[in-house]
Design a protein with these regions (language model features):
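Divalent-metal coordination cores built from histidine and acidic residues
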Residues: 12-121, 150
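Histidine/acidic residue-rich metal-binding segments in metalloenzymes
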Residues: 65-66, 98-125, 130-166
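Short linear motifs at secondary-structure transitions and domain/linker junctions
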Residues: 2, 52-59, 160-165
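Flexible loop/turn segments at secondary-structure boundaries
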Residues: 7, 34-38, 87-90, 129-132, ...
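Short, glycine/acidic-rich beta->alpha junctions
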Residues: 7-13, 134, 138
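Residue-level marker of alpha-helix boundaries and capping positions
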Residues: 5-7, 57, 101-102, 133
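Histidine-centered catalytic micro-motifs
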Residues: 1-9, 154-159
């Protein structure tokens, strides 16, 4: 996991020379529930944490728009992105804990749309604040979307020992 997505490195250095010289041919972005797309309602909080937004025009909302922008930059590596559960969640409700039914419906609709538009899969992470607030119900629902489209649902766990089976 190279973090080329989080810091907009894929746009700032599309050739990704350092990775190519090391033999890396593919980057899978959007790990740990954080992705560059979709950015619903124009929310940029997920991106702003890692990158200076003055360096690139983040001009996409939907995953298809992100993919089009990426294609224009002609990356030097294969680049696939997961749709981030925490990114969607944060865009919908900020830091509140539980999604209401309508909000969950929006989250699932947007995740499904992102996969239809080319997202490689879905990612969640229970170690980050947004992911840690997610209910089992919404995580299972995202898993069902991944199954529906036969794509991975990658889940990051921060605690590999204590509390893992709780």
């Amino acid at each position: 996991h190279a973090r080329s997505d989080h810091n907009l490195g894929i746009f700032l250095n599309p050739k990704q020379d350092i990775f190519v010289r090391q033999g890396v041919t593919t980057i899978v972005a959007g790990q740990h529930g954080a992705s560059l797309a979709p950015l619903m309602y124009g929310a940029l909080e997920s991106v702003r944490k890692w990158a200076d937004l003055h360096q690139i025009n983040v001009n996409w909302h939907e995953f298809s728009e992100f993919a089009s922008q990426l294609k224009r930059f002609k990356p030097g590596v294969n680049f696939a992105s997961l749709v981030g559960h925490s990114t969607l969640r944060r865009d919908i409700l900020g830091k509140r804990k539980l999604l209401e039914k309508k909000e969950l419906d929006v989250l699932l609709r947007e995740a499904r749309l992102a996969v239809k538009q080319g997202a490689y899969g879905v990612s969640s992470d229970f170690g980050f604040v947004s992911g840690g607030l997610a209910s089992v119900k919404e995580t299972v629902a995202l898993g069902k979307i991944a199954k529906e489209f036969d794509v991975p649902h990658m889940i990051g766990l921060r605690d590999g020992k204590d509390g893992l089976m709780d």
